[in-house]
A protein has these predicted regions:
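Polytopic membrane enzymes that build or remodel cell-surface glycoconjugates and lipids
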Residues: 1-341
Length: 341
């Protein structure tokens, strides 16, 4: 499956050979002090720098050392922008091939497996994640997630180690791989009769996957806290007042332990950052809905959620927010109903 999917990915997402570094690529590679080995930065120092090569006290909160390791390695060979873009396309094809294998292991239907890989390789959720150089973080994070799904087919004694390694790989590629922590155990619960029809042991496999994914998350946070000691956000550095409810105090303590670097509030880059919570949720639901429609009907592509593509909404209830909420709720509920039936 890898070869034909690679051809399709190349046809759909390859930029012109004369392409240059555009938008964030200039900051990620040309101005990245780690990639350019400025200031005596060693190869291993990626663990002490953020995605843009900045130290903890200047970071915007993106801790992704694995893409930096890859960039530094390839940068020593070539600085040609087309090459750095092209291997991103090939990684996307590799993800599609791996998803094809996972689908076949689950269904034993070759045609359906090829269809899943074809849909995945042709309908990237974000074109920027495949055709843009900085999208390597998304692609590698996706590789970790799909590899974790593939690990569920391993014997019970080996599966936790595979899930642990895959989730850890995804987390060090991009923070959004955090979604694997709850989703992979859920997938283990659902897929156990398909991957191990003679001895499904749903609860045991799901618990093992949860322990493995949770251990990967804890190790990731502890290593990031030690290797990348970023400043504590002001809202977390301030102690909670006396009488704070236990649930809120527990959430505060969890966020302090997680120690996410302060995120920038730039309305031009992310207009939802200055919106209140209800309007932020409504705007996020609209982003989700538009992303889904762009996958199926890519008439007008929006590279990201920055202004003016996705300005903060002026009301809470509108078609985009309602459709986004419906598409978040209905597919899981429908899948659950089909599973029970």
């Amino acid at each position: 499956a890898a070869a034909p999917l690679a051809v399709i990915a190349v046809i759909l997402f390859t930029r012109a050979p004369s392409t240059n570094y555009i938008f964030d690529e200039q900051e990620a590679l040309l101005a990245n002090p780690y990639v350019n080995a400025k200031g005596g930065l060693r190869f291993i120092d990626a663990i002490h720098r953020d995605f843009w090569g900045l130290p903890p006290d200047r970071s915007v909160g993106s801790y992704r050392p694995l893409p930096n390791f890859l960039w530094r390695t390839v940068w020593a060979v070539t600085k040609q922008p087309f090459f750095h873009h092209f291997y991103n396309v090939l990684f996307h094809a590799a993800n599609a091939a791996l998803l094809t294998c996972v689908t076949f292991w689950l269904t034993r239907r070759r045609g359906l497996a090829y269809l899943a890989g074809l849909v995945f390789v042709g309908c990237a959720v974000l074109t920027e994640a495949v055709s843009g150089i900085v999208g390597i973080a998304d692609v590698l994070g996706g590789l970790g997630a799909i590899a974790a799904l593939a690990a569920l087919a391993l014997p019970a004694w080996a599966m936790p180690f595979g899930v642990f390694a895959a989730v850890l790989f995804g987390l060090f590629s991009k923070e959004s791989a955090l979604v694997c922590v709850p989703l992979i155990p859920f997938a283990a619960l659902i897929a156990a009769p398909l991957t191990h029809p003679t001895r499904p042991a749903r609860l045991v496999r799901s618990l093992l996957a949860l322990l493995a994914a949770g251990a990967a998350f804890v190790l990731y946070v502890e290593l990031r806290r030690r290797w990348f000691p970023s400043p504590m956000p002001a809202e977390l550095a301030t102690p909670l007042p006396e009488g704070t409810p236990l649930a809120r105090r527990a959430l505060h303590d969890l966020l302090v332990w997680f120690h996410q670097a302060p995120l920038p509030r730039d309305p031009l880059n992310n207009p939802l950052s200055t919106a209140d919570t209800p309007h932020r949720i409504a705007g996020a639901l609209r982003v989700y809905w538009r992303g889904l429609t762009q996958v199926v009907f890519p008439w007008t592509l929006s590279g990201d959620y920055s202004y003016p593509q996705e300005p903060a909404p002026d009301r809470l209830v509108f078609f985009g927010s309602v459709a986004g909420a419906a598409m978040m709720a209905l597919p899981p509920l429908g899948s659950l109903a089909l599973w029970i039936a």
